[in-house]
C-alpha cells in the first residue's frame, strides 16, 4: 500500500451523512465522492517517491446528503447499486473521487538521464502506486474491498474508483535514479480527468 498522507477528516465528514446508530442500510458500497480535489505533491526522495496528497471543502462532497441526484447517477455509472447490506460505522466509509482520472504524465524540467531529455515523459521509468475499489464492485462485491496496485505509467493503468479515504490519491515511484544524483529537479505531474479537466503540480526532487 502506498505511503499514506495526513488523514483529512474524511471519516468524520462521511459519518455525518448517515444515521447515528451503530449501523445503517445502504444500496451503495461507496459512501461518497470528492469532486476535483485540490492536489499537492510531497517529495520523499530517500524512498524515490512523490506522493499526491489532496484536500477539499464541503462543496466538493457528493453523497446521499449533498447532491443526491449526482451521487445516485455516479453510483449507477459505476454499477454500485446492489450492495444492499447493513453497514457498521466502525467499518469505515469508502470514498472515491469524481470524475475518475484518465491519465497521469510525469515530466522533468532538466535532463533526467541519457534517455530522458528536458520536458520529455518519464512514464516509462515511473510506477504509480494506488488502491482501487473497482474490482470489488464489478465482481458483485466479492473478494478484497480495496486492492493495491503498482504499475508502470506507460502501461496506462486503470485509475477508476481510486481510493480517497485517506489523505493521498496515489504515489509515483522512480525505478531509476537521474544521471546526476546531486542535482535538483523540478518534477511536474499532469493529471487529466475523464471530463477533460487537467491539473498540473510541480515539486522539487533531489536525492542527495
Can you name each region flagged by the protein language model?
Residues 1-9:
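Bacterial N-terminal signal peptides that target proteins for export
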Residues 12-13:
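Intrinsically disordered, low-complexity segments
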Residues 16-19:
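C-terminal motif of bacterial Sec signal peptides marking the signal peptidase cleavage site
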Residues 21-208:
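Non-catalytic macromolecular-recognition regions in eukaryotic signaling proteins
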